[in-house]
Protein backbone atom coordinates (compact mmCIF):
# COMPACT_ATOMS: atom_id res chain seq x y z
CA UNK A 1 0.00 0.00 0.00
CA UNK A 2 1.53 3.33 -1.05
CA UNK A 3 1.09 6.19 1.36
CA UNK A 4 3.84 8.55 0.21
CA UNK A 5 6.68 10.07 2.24
CA UNK A 6 6.05 10.96 5.87
CA UNK A 7 6.19 14.60 6.92
CA UNK A 8 6.50 16.45 10.22
CA UNK A 9 3.45 15.87 12.38
CA UNK A 10 2.45 12.58 10.77
CA UNK A 11 1.76 9.64 13.06
CA UNK A 12 3.16 6.16 12.55
CA UNK A 13 1.51 3.94 15.13
CA UNK A 14 2.38 5.58 18.45
CA UNK A 15 5.25 7.65 17.03
CA UNK A 16 5.06 11.27 15.86
CA UNK A 17 7.31 12.21 12.96
CA UNK A 18 9.54 15.22 13.71
CA UNK A 19 11.45 15.46 10.43
CA UNK A 20 13.05 13.46 7.64
CA UNK A 21 16.77 13.02 8.33
CA UNK A 22 17.93 10.64 5.63
CA UNK A 23 17.13 9.15 2.26
CA UNK A 24 18.98 5.96 1.38
CA UNK A 25 18.95 3.62 -1.58
CA UNK A 26 16.28 1.42 -0.03
CA UNK A 27 14.62 3.36 2.77
CA UNK A 28 13.77 6.74 4.27
CA UNK A 29 14.89 7.66 7.76
CA UNK A 30 12.94 9.90 10.13
CA UNK A 31 13.46 11.51 13.50
CA UNK A 32 10.39 10.76 15.63
CA UNK A 33 9.11 11.06 19.18
CA UNK A 34 7.44 8.52 21.43
CA UNK A 35 4.47 9.55 23.60
CA UNK A 36 6.87 10.13 26.51
CA UNK A 37 8.89 12.57 24.41
CA UNK A 38 11.90 10.32 23.91
CA UNK A 39 13.41 10.71 20.46
CA UNK A 40 13.97 7.72 18.22
CA UNK A 41 14.89 7.06 14.61
CA UNK A 42 12.39 5.30 12.34
CA UNK A 43 13.43 3.57 9.14
CA UNK A 44 10.75 2.95 6.50
CA UNK A 45 11.34 1.22 3.12
CA UNK A 46 10.60 3.20 -0.02
CA UNK A 47 7.10 2.87 -1.40
CA UNK A 48 8.61 1.80 -4.73
CA UNK A 49 9.93 -1.36 -3.08
CA UNK A 50 6.79 -2.40 -1.29
CA UNK A 51 5.44 -4.42 -4.20
CA UNK A 52 8.62 -6.49 -4.39
CA UNK A 53 8.55 -9.62 -2.25
CA UNK A 54 12.34 -9.80 -2.14
CA UNK A 55 12.62 -6.21 -0.96
CA UNK A 56 9.99 -6.82 1.71
CA UNK A 57 11.86 -9.94 2.91
CA UNK A 58 15.14 -8.04 2.99
CA UNK A 59 13.69 -5.32 5.20
CA UNK A 60 12.27 -7.96 7.52
CA UNK A 61 15.70 -9.56 7.66
CA UNK A 62 17.20 -6.21 8.65
CA UNK A 63 14.65 -6.06 11.47
CA UNK A 64 15.64 -9.58 12.55
CA UNK A 65 19.35 -8.73 12.44
CA UNK A 66 18.79 -5.57 14.49
CA UNK A 67 17.07 -7.65 17.16
CA UNK A 68 20.04 -10.01 17.44
CA UNK A 69 22.62 -7.32 18.16
CA UNK A 70 23.11 -5.67 21.54
CA UNK A 71 26.36 -3.72 21.78
CA UNK A 72 27.14 -0.07 22.66
CA UNK A 73 28.97 0.26 19.35
CA UNK A 74 25.93 -0.76 17.28
CA UNK A 75 22.81 1.37 16.91
CA UNK A 76 20.25 -0.27 19.16
CA UNK A 77 16.90 -1.47 17.82
CA UNK A 78 13.98 -0.72 20.13
CA UNK A 79 11.06 -1.94 18.14
CA UNK A 80 9.65 -2.77 14.76
CA UNK A 81 6.20 -3.12 13.38
CA UNK A 82 3.83 -2.64 10.52
CA UNK A 83 1.11 -0.09 9.91
CA UNK A 84 -1.27 -0.47 6.97
CA UNK A 85 1.10 -3.03 5.38
CA UNK A 86 4.03 -0.63 5.76
CA UNK A 87 6.85 -2.14 7.87
CA UNK A 88 9.11 0.08 9.93
CA UNK A 89 12.11 -0.26 12.21
CA UNK A 90 12.61 1.83 15.36
CA UNK A 91 16.21 2.59 16.25
CA UNK A 92 18.16 4.42 18.93
CA UNK A 93 18.57 8.15 18.33
CA UNK A 94 22.25 9.03 18.54
CA UNK A 95 23.28 12.64 19.03
CA UNK A 96 26.39 12.71 16.89
CA UNK A 97 27.87 13.28 13.45
CA UNK A 98 29.05 10.82 10.84
CA UNK A 99 32.67 9.78 10.64
CA UNK A 100 32.65 11.40 7.20
CA UNK A 101 31.86 14.74 8.83
CA UNK A 102 34.58 14.16 11.43
CA UNK A 103 37.05 13.65 8.57
CA UNK A 104 35.81 16.76 6.76
CA UNK A 105 36.32 18.86 9.89
CA UNK A 106 39.65 17.40 10.97
CA UNK A 107 41.27 16.19 7.76
CA UNK A 108 43.83 13.54 8.60
CA UNK A 109 43.39 12.27 12.13
CA UNK A 110 46.28 11.76 14.56
CA UNK A 111 47.19 8.08 14.83
CA UNK A 112 45.92 7.66 18.43
CA UNK A 113 42.53 9.14 17.49
CA UNK A 114 42.26 7.08 14.30
CA UNK A 115 43.16 3.89 16.14
CA UNK A 116 40.65 4.64 18.91
CA UNK A 117 37.86 5.00 16.35
CA UNK A 118 38.96 1.89 14.45
CA UNK A 119 39.25 -0.09 17.68
CA UNK A 120 35.71 0.82 18.72
CA UNK A 121 34.44 -0.12 15.26
CA UNK A 122 36.28 -3.44 15.41
CA UNK A 123 34.84 -4.19 18.86
CA UNK A 124 31.33 -3.53 17.57
CA UNK A 125 31.83 -5.67 14.49
CA UNK A 126 33.40 -8.43 16.59
CA UNK A 127 30.03 -8.66 18.37
CA UNK A 128 28.23 -8.83 15.03
CA UNK A 129 30.62 -11.44 13.65
CA UNK A 130 30.26 -13.55 16.80
CA UNK A 131 26.51 -13.56 16.09
CA UNK A 132 27.02 -14.66 12.50
CA UNK A 133 26.33 -11.25 10.96
CA UNK A 134 28.47 -9.38 8.42
CA UNK A 135 27.65 -5.75 7.62
CA UNK A 136 29.04 -5.63 4.03
CA UNK A 137 28.62 -1.85 3.64
CA UNK A 138 30.88 -0.30 6.26
CA UNK A 139 31.85 3.26 5.35
CA UNK A 140 32.21 6.62 7.14
CA UNK A 141 28.60 7.54 6.32
CA UNK A 142 27.44 4.49 8.30
CA UNK A 143 29.43 5.39 11.41
CA UNK A 144 28.31 7.96 14.00
CA UNK A 145 30.62 9.67 16.50
CA UNK A 146 29.16 11.37 19.57
CA UNK A 147 30.62 14.44 21.33
CA UNK A 148 31.79 12.07 24.09
CA UNK A 149 33.74 9.98 21.59
CA UNK A 150 31.40 6.99 21.37
CA UNK A 151 31.60 5.35 17.94
CA UNK A 152 28.49 3.59 16.61
CA UNK A 153 27.91 1.43 13.53
CA UNK A 154 24.59 1.99 11.75
CA UNK A 155 22.65 0.67 8.75
CA UNK A 156 22.73 -3.11 8.46
CA UNK A 157 20.53 -2.83 5.36
CA UNK A 158 22.56 -5.21 3.20
CA UNK A 159 23.99 -7.26 6.04
CA UNK A 160 24.41 -11.01 5.67
CA UNK A 161 23.26 -13.42 8.37
CA UNK A 162 24.87 -16.84 8.56
CA UNK A 163 22.53 -19.59 7.45
CA UNK A 164 20.02 -17.23 5.85
CA UNK A 165 18.83 -17.96 2.35
CA UNK A 166 20.08 -15.69 -0.40
CA UNK A 167 17.62 -12.96 -1.35
CA UNK A 168 17.43 -11.64 -4.89
CA UNK A 169 15.19 -8.88 -6.16
CA UNK A 170 15.06 -6.42 -9.00
CA UNK A 171 16.70 -3.57 -7.06
CA UNK A 172 19.60 -5.70 -5.88
CA UNK A 173 22.66 -6.75 -7.85
CA UNK A 174 25.26 -9.26 -6.76
CA UNK A 175 27.76 -6.41 -6.44
CA UNK A 176 26.65 -4.60 -3.30
CA UNK A 177 28.55 -2.01 -1.32
CA UNK A 178 30.19 1.38 -1.87
CA UNK A 179 33.06 1.38 -4.43
CA UNK A 180 35.68 3.10 -2.24
CA UNK A 181 35.18 0.50 0.51
CA UNK A 182 34.38 -2.66 -1.48
CA UNK A 183 36.54 -5.72 -1.00
CA UNK A 184 37.85 -7.50 -4.12
CA UNK A 185 35.45 -10.40 -3.56
CA UNK A 186 32.50 -7.98 -3.58
CA UNK A 187 33.73 -6.49 -6.85
CA UNK A 188 33.76 -10.03 -8.24
CA UNK A 189 30.12 -10.51 -7.22
CA UNK A 190 30.66 -12.80 -4.23
CA UNK A 191 28.56 -12.54 -1.08
CA UNK A 192 31.39 -11.73 1.29
CA UNK A 193 31.72 -12.50 4.99
CA UNK A 194 33.41 -11.15 8.12
CA UNK A 195 36.66 -10.68 6.19
CA UNK A 196 34.80 -8.36 3.81
CA UNK A 197 34.08 -6.11 6.80
CA UNK A 198 37.76 -6.31 7.78
CA UNK A 199 38.68 -4.91 4.37
CA UNK A 200 36.28 -1.98 4.76
CA UNK A 201 37.60 -1.28 8.26
CA UNK A 202 41.12 -1.25 6.80
CA UNK A 203 40.08 1.26 4.14
CA UNK A 204 38.56 3.51 6.80
CA UNK A 205 41.66 3.32 8.99
CA UNK A 206 43.86 4.09 5.97
CA UNK A 207 41.63 7.05 5.12
CA UNK A 208 41.70 8.44 8.65
CA UNK A 209 45.50 8.26 8.72
CA UNK A 210 46.20 9.42 5.15
CA UNK A 211 43.35 11.85 4.56
CA UNK A 212 42.27 9.93 1.47
CA UNK A 213 41.26 6.44 0.40
CA UNK A 214 43.96 4.17 -1.07
CA UNK A 215 42.51 4.14 -4.58
CA UNK A 216 40.78 6.90 -6.49
CA UNK A 217 39.44 7.06 -10.03
CA UNK A 218 37.29 8.98 -12.48
CA UNK A 219 34.38 6.59 -12.04
CA UNK A 220 33.25 3.77 -9.73
CA UNK A 221 34.38 1.02 -12.11
CA UNK A 222 37.92 2.41 -12.17
CA UNK A 223 38.03 2.38 -8.37
CA UNK A 224 36.58 -1.14 -8.18
CA UNK A 225 39.18 -2.45 -10.63
CA UNK A 226 41.98 -1.10 -8.43
CA UNK A 227 40.63 -2.98 -5.42
CA UNK A 228 41.19 -6.17 -7.40
CA UNK A 229 44.45 -5.39 -9.20
CA UNK A 230 46.32 -2.34 -7.86
CA UNK A 231 49.02 -2.57 -5.17
CA UNK A 232 48.32 -0.88 -1.85
CA UNK A 233 49.97 2.55 -1.55
CA UNK A 234 52.37 2.90 1.35
CA UNK A 235 50.98 4.85 4.29
CA UNK A 236 54.48 5.76 5.40
CA UNK A 237 55.25 7.27 2.00
CA UNK A 238 52.23 9.51 2.54
CA UNK A 239 53.26 10.31 6.12
CA UNK A 240 56.63 9.10 7.35
CA UNK A 241 55.51 9.53 10.97
CA UNK A 242 52.93 6.76 10.80
CA UNK A 243 54.44 3.89 12.82
CA UNK A 244 55.35 0.83 10.77
CA UNK A 245 53.45 -1.59 13.05
CA UNK A 246 50.28 0.44 12.46
CA UNK A 247 50.84 0.33 8.72
CA UNK A 248 51.28 -3.43 9.08
CA UNK A 249 47.82 -3.74 10.65
CA UNK A 250 46.28 -1.79 7.76
CA UNK A 251 48.20 -3.91 5.26
CA UNK A 252 46.85 -7.12 6.75
CA UNK A 253 43.29 -5.77 6.60
CA UNK A 254 43.69 -4.92 2.92
CA UNK A 255 45.06 -8.14 1.52
CA UNK A 256 43.46 -9.03 -1.81
CA UNK A 257 43.03 -12.63 -0.67
CA UNK A 258 40.47 -12.82 2.17
CA UNK A 259 42.34 -15.78 3.68
CA UNK A 260 45.32 -13.49 4.36
CA UNK A 261 43.31 -10.91 6.30
CA UNK A 262 42.21 -11.04 9.92
CA UNK A 263 39.64 -13.81 10.18
CA UNK A 264 37.17 -11.55 11.97
CA UNK A 265 36.92 -8.22 13.75
CA UNK A 266 37.84 -9.79 17.08
CA UNK A 267 41.36 -10.48 15.80
CA UNK A 268 41.66 -6.96 14.40
CA UNK A 269 40.40 -5.44 17.64
CA UNK A 270 43.00 -7.39 19.60
CA UNK A 271 45.84 -6.03 17.44
CA UNK A 272 44.54 -2.47 17.65
CA UNK A 273 44.35 -2.81 21.43
CA UNK A 274 47.92 -4.09 21.46
CA UNK A 275 49.02 -1.13 19.38
CA UNK A 276 47.36 1.21 21.86
CA UNK A 277 49.16 -0.63 24.67
CA UNK A 278 52.38 -0.90 22.56
CA UNK A 279 52.54 -4.67 23.12
CA UNK A 280 54.28 -5.28 19.79
CA UNK A 281 55.53 -8.75 20.62
CA UNK A 282 51.95 -10.06 20.76
CA UNK A 283 50.84 -8.78 17.35
CA UNK A 284 49.34 -11.19 14.83
CA UNK A 285 50.25 -9.36 11.62
CA UNK A 286 53.26 -11.59 10.87
CA UNK A 287 56.96 -11.12 10.21
CA UNK A 288 56.64 -10.59 6.46
CA UNK A 289 54.41 -7.57 6.93
CA UNK A 290 56.74 -6.01 9.48
CA UNK A 291 59.77 -6.56 7.27
CA UNK A 292 58.09 -4.78 4.37
CA UNK A 293 57.04 -1.94 6.66
CA UNK A 294 60.53 -1.27 8.06
CA UNK A 295 62.82 -2.35 5.22
CA UNK A 296 63.85 1.19 4.30
CA UNK A 297 66.97 2.40 6.05
CA UNK A 298 65.09 4.98 8.02
CA UNK A 299 62.57 2.50 9.33
CA UNK A 300 63.72 2.39 12.93
CA UNK A 301 63.98 6.16 13.49
CA UNK A 302 60.63 6.71 11.80
CA UNK A 303 58.89 4.22 14.05
CA UNK A 304 60.34 5.80 17.17
CA UNK A 305 59.55 9.30 15.90
CA UNK A 306 55.97 8.27 15.26
CA UNK A 307 55.30 7.38 18.88
CA UNK A 308 55.06 10.18 21.39
CA UNK A 309 57.38 9.80 24.35
CA UNK A 310 54.49 10.86 26.52
CA UNK A 311 52.73 7.56 25.80
CA UNK A 312 55.59 5.15 26.49
CA UNK A 313 58.06 4.35 29.23
CA UNK A 314 61.56 2.98 28.90
CA UNK A 315 60.39 -0.64 28.89
CA UNK A 316 57.93 -0.07 26.02
CA UNK A 317 60.60 1.75 24.01
CA UNK A 318 62.93 -1.22 24.56
CA UNK A 319 60.28 -3.58 23.18
CA UNK A 320 59.97 -1.46 20.03
CA UNK A 321 63.73 -1.25 19.49
CA UNK A 322 64.23 -4.95 20.13
CA UNK A 323 61.35 -6.04 17.89
CA UNK A 324 62.51 -3.95 14.92
CA UNK A 325 66.16 -4.89 15.39
CA UNK A 326 65.43 -8.61 15.43
CA UNK A 327 63.00 -8.51 12.48
CA UNK A 328 64.72 -6.01 10.16
Region roles according to the model:
Residues 28:
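Conserved N-lobe ATP-binding subsite of Hanks-type protein kinase domains
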Residues 46-68:
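AlphaC helix of the eukaryotic protein kinase fold
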Residues 125, 178-283:
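C-terminal lobe helix-coil module of Hanks-type protein kinase domains
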Residues 80:
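Activation-segment/catalytic-loop signature of the eukaryotic protein kinase fold
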Residues 117-118:
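Activation segment signature within eukaryotic-like protein kinase domains
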Residues 53, 147-184, 188:
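Activation segment of protein kinases
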Residues 84-98, 102:
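Conserved short submotifs of the Hanks-type protein kinase catalytic core
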Residues 123-133:
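Protein kinase catalytic-loop region centered on the HRD/HxD motif
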